[in-house]
């Protein structure tokens, strides 16, 4: 399984982007539009294995809810995956958001692709 690592600043930017996206306002800044696009692409690109689309959408929304509202896996209800898998998917989701926002450079993208 691949390891997805973000440094502290990248993680803070991604979490802020998700929180801003969860509280959409009428006026959108360039950052907000970029974040919304990156989040939509990350939701589509998240690899949660070969499961039904209904279950996949629940997992993706629980990950989004976990980041947006700071909720732990234990308080999210039925997530259709165990705790370890959930947090691995969450890391992957954050990495995809950061990558889609342009925070990840090519060198790090290649390192992540090697797995670990």
Kindly give the residue locations of the regions a language model identified.
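Amphipathic alpha-helical interface surfaces
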Residues: 35-38, 59, 89
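Helix-turn-helix DNA-binding module
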Residues: 69-82
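Short amphipathic alpha helix immediately N-terminal
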Residues: 51-71
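Short, solvent-exposed secondary-structure capping/transition elements
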Residues: 72-75, 99, 106
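N-terminal interaction/assembly modules
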Residues: 1-53, 106-116
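DNA major-groove recognition helices of helix-turn-helix
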Residues: 86-100, 104
């Amino acid at each position: 399984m691949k390891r997805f690592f973000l440094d502290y600043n990248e993680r803070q930017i991604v979490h802020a982007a998700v929180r801003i996206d969860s509280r959409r306002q009428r006026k959108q800044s360039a950052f907000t539009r970029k974040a919304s696009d990156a989040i939509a692409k990350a939701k589509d690109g998240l690899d949660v294995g070969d499961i039904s689309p209904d279950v996949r959408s629940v997992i993706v929304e629980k990950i989004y809810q976990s980041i947006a509202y700071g909720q732990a896996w234990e308080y999210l209800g039925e997530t259709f995956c165990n705790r370890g898998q959930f947090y691995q998917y969450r890391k992957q989701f954050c990495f995809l958001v950061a990558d889609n926002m342009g925070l990840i450079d090519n060198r790090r993208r290649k390192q992540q692709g090697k797995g670990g």
